[in-house]
Amino acid sequence: MDIPHSAAAAASGEHIAVPLYRLAHGRTGDKGNRSNISVIAWHPALWDVLVEQVTEGAVARRFDQRRPSRVRRYLLPQLHAMNFVIDDVLDGGVNDSLNLDSHGKALAYLLLDLPLQVPAALAPHLAGPP
């Protein structure tokens, strides 16, 4: 009987700490003072870890220094992806901000460095060097 990767990993109990970019890639967009960041799993077996750990609260804490007023997460399970809409994070938006990155395009990179705990059994599905 085949055990799904997440169930096998949970049974082993071992975890490794890795940044989010080892599990997923991301893309940022903007509209006014709102940023949206898409997070897409590199492999379907990593989806459950993303749903469990890349939450609205985790994202809000990650962007705490930018003082977002609201973070919403939208799950796209058939695509093994999620989209975050983060309000009031661009210092007024493109026309009002003095930031070098007024579109917030680098925000995905900030999120992709989020540390996660991944079951060791899922290590073969992680991107990049160990």
Go through each PLM region and give its residues.
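Long, contiguous binding/interaction regions
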Residues: 2-130
